[in-house]
């Protein structure tokens, strides 16, 4: 069945009368046997309905007769004898008597009464002005703007004639006036088969004889047969031989401009994310001739006409380092780098700081345990070589024999030292243990006797540690006699000095040297600042620093003050009181000067705390100085260190005005370090030397964390 809901026919401007059929609703139709036969005749594919716009914009349909060539091919592979060629001229009188020899399949349809009445009304339509309809050539596809459809089982697209008029015998309005109004909201189940039709545009009668149409092919699936229809237009004398029909064309503008230079095009692709760097050196056109055709072939990369060549020889490709981006940046990167504040704020970086592990003293390694009294023994400063910065006093003739005997006893006892190292945990005492304890007692008594005899030569443990640290100066730096003057020089007689050092300052050498005072520590250091400025004429700049130090002496050296009373206290996180503070300073400075301030009470009550502190701070980056908590003594010590490590600067020399200085300072470098770097290198040479690892001078002034910070800056996405 076919959908009649939107069918309408109108009067055309060149014809007398056209029947106007309007039905805006869908309904169920019942078809009788006679109507089914006529519907079957419409399926013969001898008609075509042309769709056009009539008066008032109402769609109209016009029936056209065409000549078709039908070839029926069985889908199941069986040959049929129903192949035929229908080329007879259409005769309107043949309606109802046409022999459909090419169609064997028939189907019974159920049609209700209303459908019968409608079909009987359609059969009552008759032709008028038949002379106009006798065209020498029937119409086929008139325009390219049409919709092509495939019909399922019943193609109700052909009525009896091209032009229809309304017959006054029956009226559609009189037949169903009330049914559609009542059932308007109830028409939900549509049983009419959906038909897909072939519609073309309608032309006036003046243009129709002069049109010629190209042949086209239509394939229909009708039951088990594949019907292939070739539709050809038949020319006549009145129609021109050739009529050109042009389709709608539009211009396409390509916005991408092709580079005239092949190399420039390749260089531009270096910064493309999806571009492969191997392709940069592999692509080459034959004979280096670059045209638009070659570029188009390059776009179709897999085409056989375009061949890919290596841009370099085989020997050169073997030696080639496949990193064209790196070479391009090294050649074309300008030395001018501007500071971007957004980079320093948004791109935050974190560096894992190395943990500072203090070495612990095991009680069974150093012979300082007195088992009988349950206390620690005194430290042997003369004969013990295990402690760093120790000092050996030359032995006299009377002591040579005793020292030899002691050394023999020690060598004999080392053979049996693994048998029992923890005697106080044993439930019994054997003979081997007694022999070991006797050797230790003899050694201890001998050391006590030597210390009592040489009271003038020995000083307190504190002065010894201080003297040992000062004498443990690297070979590169030598102290002059003007800076340190002791009671007896160490080089002439290797005798331990008495407590305290007599320090003299040469104001001419110290005056004008510049240091930086941390603005966060002004309350603790304001008295020391006044002493240094008034007596030593040292320039002190006050700036708030991100480091937890008191003074910055040069690019790689800082000074920090700590108190001995708080050193061995443990914080909430399980570390020592100053451990995290000292760990942070080792990441920013190659040398950390630690001034440990103590009170006189500690010296008299707990003497062992000094050498314990010294062993805890046994690190190559720490330079430990133990001094009493006296402001004048602290100022003298600081002025001595300033004269050794600091240098002179002008007033305006430490201002950071250039963009290069601001970049380095944004990396948390101190001002002295920034000035020293830019005196030796430009910023470009400095960064280039770090990336290529060609200059070791940078690594001598920077810590590992500072080097890692610069490398993370270079690897950021700009």
UniProtKB/Swiss-Prot annotation:
Organism whose genome encodes this protein: Vanderwaltozyma polyspora (strain ATCC 22028 / DSM 70294 / BCRC 21397 / CBS 2163 / NBRC 10782 / NRRL Y-8283 / UCD 57-17)
Gene Ontology cellular-component annotations: chromosome; nucleus
Keywords, in A-Z order: Cell cycle, Chromosomal rearrangement, Chromosome, Chromosome partition, DNA-binding, Meiosis, Nucleotide-binding, Nucleus
Subcellular location: Nucleus; Chromosome
UniProt function note: Required for initiation of meiotic chromosome synapsis. Involved in synaptonemal complex formation, a structure that tethers a pair of homologous chromosomes along their lengths and plays a central role in recombination and homolog segregation during meiosis.
Family membership noted in the UniProt record: Belongs to the ZIP2 family.
Organism phylogeny: Eukaryota, Fungi, Dikarya, Ascomycota, Saccharomycotina
A GO term for molecular function: nucleotide binding
Domain of life: Eukaryota
GO BP annotations listed: chromosome segregation; meiotic cell cycle
Listed Gene3D superfamilies: 3.40.50.10130
Keyword Cytoplasm: no
Protein name, per record: Protein ZIP2
């Amino acid at each position: 069945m076919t959908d009649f809901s939107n069918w309408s026919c109108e009067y055309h401007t060149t014809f007398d009368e056209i029947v106007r059929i309007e039905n805006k609703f869908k309904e169920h139709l019942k078809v009788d046997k006679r109507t089914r036969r006529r519907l079957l005749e419409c399926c013969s594919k001898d008609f075509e309905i042309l769709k056009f716009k009539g008066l008032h914009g109402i769609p109209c349909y016009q029936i056209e007769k065409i000549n078709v060539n039908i070839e029926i091919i069985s889908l199941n592979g069986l040959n049929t004898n129903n192949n035929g060629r229908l080329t007879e001229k259409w005769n309107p009188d043949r309606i109802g008597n046409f022999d459909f020899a090419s169609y064997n399949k028939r189907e019974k349809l159920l049609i209700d009464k209303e459908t019968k009445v409608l079909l009987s009304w359609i059969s009552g339509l008759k032709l008028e002005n038949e002379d106009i309809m006798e065209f020498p050539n029937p119409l086929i596809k008139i325009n390219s703007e049409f919709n092509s459809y495939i019909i399922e089982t019943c193609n109700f697209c052909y009525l009896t004639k091209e032009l229809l008029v309304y017959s006054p015998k029956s009226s559609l309005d009189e037949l169903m006036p009330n049914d559609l109004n009542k059932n308007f909201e109830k028409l939900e189940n549509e049983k009419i088969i959906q038909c897909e039709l072939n519609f073309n545009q309608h032309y006036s009668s003046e243009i129709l004889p002069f049109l010629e149409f190209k042949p086209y092919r239509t394939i229909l699936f009708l039951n088990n047969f594949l019907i292939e229809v070739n539709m050809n237009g038949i020319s006549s004398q009145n129609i021109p031989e050739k009529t050109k029909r042009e389709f709608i064309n539009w211009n396409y503008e390509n916005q991408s401009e092709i580079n005239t230079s092949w190399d420039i095009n390749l260089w531009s692709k270096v910064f493309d994310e999806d571009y492969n760097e191997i392709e940069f050196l592999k692509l080459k056109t034959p004979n280096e001739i670059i045209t638009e055709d070659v570029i188009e072939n390059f776009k179709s990369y897999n085409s056989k006409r375009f061949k890919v060549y290596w841009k370099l020889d085989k020997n050169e490709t073997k030696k080639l380092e496949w990193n064209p981006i790196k070479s391009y940046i090294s050649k074309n990167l300008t030395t001018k780098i501007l500071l971007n504040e957004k980079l320093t704020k948004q791109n935050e970086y974190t560096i894992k700081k190395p943990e500072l592990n203090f070495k612990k003293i095991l009680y069974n390694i150093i012979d300082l345990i007195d088992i009988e009294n349950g206390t620690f023994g005194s430290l042997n400063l003369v004969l013990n070589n295990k402690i760093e910065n120790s000092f050996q006093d030359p032995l006299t003739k009377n002591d040579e024999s005793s020292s030899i005997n002691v050394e023999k006893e020690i060598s004999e006892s080392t053979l049996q030292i693994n048998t029992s190292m923890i005697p106080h945990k044993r439930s019994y005492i054997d003979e081997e243990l007694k022999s070991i304890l006797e050797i230790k007692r003899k050694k201890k008594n001998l050391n006590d006797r030597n210390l009592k005899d040489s009271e003038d030569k020995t000083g307190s443990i504190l002065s010894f540690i201080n003297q040992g640290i000062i004498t443990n100066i690297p070979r590169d730096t030598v102290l002059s006699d003007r800076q340190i003057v002791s009671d007896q020089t160490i080089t002439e007689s290797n005798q331990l000095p008495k407590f305290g050092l007599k320090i003299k300052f040469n104001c001419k050498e110290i005056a004008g040297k510049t240091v930086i005072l941390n603005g966060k520590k002004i309350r603790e250091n304001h008295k020391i600042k006044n002493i240094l400025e008034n007596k030593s004429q040292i320039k002190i700049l006050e700036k708030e620093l991100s480091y937890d130090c008191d003074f910055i002496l040069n690019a790689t050296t800082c000074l920090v003050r700590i108190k001995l009373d708080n050193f061995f206290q443990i914080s909430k996180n399980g570390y020592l009181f100053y451990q995290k503070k000292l760990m942070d300073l080792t990441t920013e400075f190659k040398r950390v000067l630690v001034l440990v301030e103590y009170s006189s009470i500690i010296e008299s009550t707990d003497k062992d705390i000094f050498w314990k502190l010294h062993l805890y701070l046994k690190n190559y980056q720490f330079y430990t100085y133990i001094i009493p908590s006296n402001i004048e003594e602290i100022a003298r010590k600081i002025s001595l260190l300033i004269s050794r490590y600091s240098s002179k600067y002008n007033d305006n020399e430490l201002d950071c005005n250039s963009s290069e200085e601001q970049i380095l300072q944004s990396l948390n470098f101190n001002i002295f370090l920034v000035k020293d770097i830019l005196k030796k290198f430009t910023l470009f040479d400095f960064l280039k030397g770090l990336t290529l690892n060609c200059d070791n001078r940078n690594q001598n002034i920077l810590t590992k964390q500072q080097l890692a910070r610069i490398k993370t800056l270079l690897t950021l996405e700009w």
